[in-house]
Structure formats: structure tokens, C-alpha cells
Amino acid sequence: MTDITPEQTQPAKPARPRGRLTRWWDSDVAWSFRHSPVAIVATFVVAVMSLAALLAPWIAPYHPFDPATLNLLDGFTPPMQENQFTGNVFWLGTDDQGRDIFSAILYGSRISLFVGISAVLFAMTLGVTLGLIAGYVGGWIDTLIMRVADVQLSFPSILIALLVFGIARGFIPPAYRADMAIWVLIVSIGLSDWVQYARTVRGATLVERSKDYVQAARLIGVPSGLIMLRHVLPNVLGPVLVIATIGLALAIITEATLSFLGVGVPPTQPSLGTLIRIGQGFLFSGEWWIILFPSIALLALALAVNLLGDWMRDALNPKLR
């Protein structure tokens, strides 16, 4: 007969619970990300450009919008060439005022990203709130919100943003318009993009409110606001994150368009769109680098964010898993 040792009779140690990061790494979304070269490259581009924009005051060779650091003799210096008057060399060249294009892109990206992210957060907050109310309450409130959304959808987003921007500036005293320009721009872009969030959340809320867990919460007397925030909202956020990612690229392009038209951020705080507008005046005079490099930066940022949003849409779609 085989003897049983005390070690063999001891119960097995329970497995350690996996951390949240480990569970995410083993999820279908993480697996899709690891096997998607497009998503990896897009994430890398967005991360590098965002980090460079955030650290612009420390990594930019010059402060391109400080008059004390500008030298007109450096104007129109081609990329990687020595200026014949000052002997300075600029990686991406300079504009007519002697501003370093590389430094201007870093500072301009900060404004573009700040406006884009803030506008998306504003539009998402407004759209999700109205969509939850419309889908959960229903009745004439649902009809009113959706009819307003339908009317707004009949106009281009850029036109809505221009209209809101012009009306808002009319109520701001001239002395404060420059300081409030960025915030007015954020609200204008946000008000032009809230509809898609509201329609998506409303549709998902209509499905969720008829489920048993919502009906049970109603029966035990949970307030409607608490049901929407604690039970319905977490289950409708998946599509919202996808819309927000794609909407960030749209918000950045909208901001650049408005700034290119001269109705965006003030000249003292130029974005990528403002830099493109400055370079447009020298496009046919031989100084091609003034418009080329800001345009490439805007294209790379918007394209990377858009590709990341496309991947997220496919990764979160259960039908494609």
C-alpha cells in the first residue's frame, strides 16, 4: 500500500485573482489591438504627437510667438539651410516673421488638441445627457429633442459652428473677445456635433429601459435619475467611445477649417489651421515649407485618430468577433 504523506493531503492553494490590467490584456479588444498593425501605428502617432505638444515649452527650440525671440532677418529660411544673415539653421525652416516652423507646429498642435478634446467632451456630455432623457422619459420630450436633432442634421456641421461662433461673439465685449475666443470655439464645435451622441444613446436607452433589471429598479422605487446614471448609462457607453474617437478627428479638422477662415483662435495663440492660413499666402512665391509641414502635421494627426476610431468600432462590435 502506498503511504500518503502530509504534503499530499494538504488542500491546493487558491489561484491568485487576476488584476484588472491582466484581465484587459487577455480580452478580445486587447487581442484585436495586438494583431492590428494599423491600430498600433495610429496609437503610436497619436501618442507621440500628443506628448510632443504637451511638452512643447520644454522641447521646442524657440518660442515662435514671443516677439522678444523673433528676428526678421531669419525670415524665409529654407529647411535645414543656414540663414545668410544670422547663420542660424532651422529644421523645418521659418516663415516671413522668422518663426521656427517646427516650434510653431508643436505649439499649434497644443491648441488644436486642446480645442478638439474639449469640444468632444462638451458634445459628448450634452449629447449623452439629452439622449438618456429622450430615450428613458419618452413622450413629448423625446419628440422635441429628436426634432431639434433632425433639423440640425439638415445643415453642415461647419455651418452650425460658424453660426454659433458668430452669435456668441456678438454677446462678448470687444475687450474680452481674444481671451474668450478659444472657449467660444469649443462651444461652437461642441454644439455642432452633439446630435450623433444623442441619437445613438437614445436608441440604446430604448433597448435598455425595457430590460428586467431596469423594471426591477423601478418597482423597488429607485429614482429615475439614479436608474439612468447607475444602470442605463454604463451599458450604452460602448458606442459613445467610438463616436468620441472619430469625433475627435472631425473636431480637429473643424477647428483647423475655422482658423483657416480667420474665425478661430486669435493670432497670439495660433493652431495648425492658423499656420496653414499663414502659409497659404506664400504658396505660389516659392516658400512652400511654410504651408507644407503644418499641413502634414494636421493630416497625420487627423488620420491617425480616425484610423484608431475605425479600429475601435470594429473591435467593440460583437458581430465581428
What role is predicted for each listed range?
Residues 97-321:
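Alpha-helical transmembrane segments of integral membrane proteins
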Residues 3, 15-68, 145-148, 236:
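N-terminal signal-anchor/first transmembrane alpha helix
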Residues 21-22, 79-83, 249:
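Short linear motifs in intrinsically disordered
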Residues 10-30, 87-102, 134-138, 225-229, ...:
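Short, membrane-interfacial amphipathic segments enriched in basic
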Residues 1-9:
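N-terminal acidic, proline/glycine-rich, low-complexity intrinsically disordered segments
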Residues 3-4, 44, 52-93, 261-269:
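Hydrophobic alpha-helical transmembrane segments of membrane transport/permease proteins
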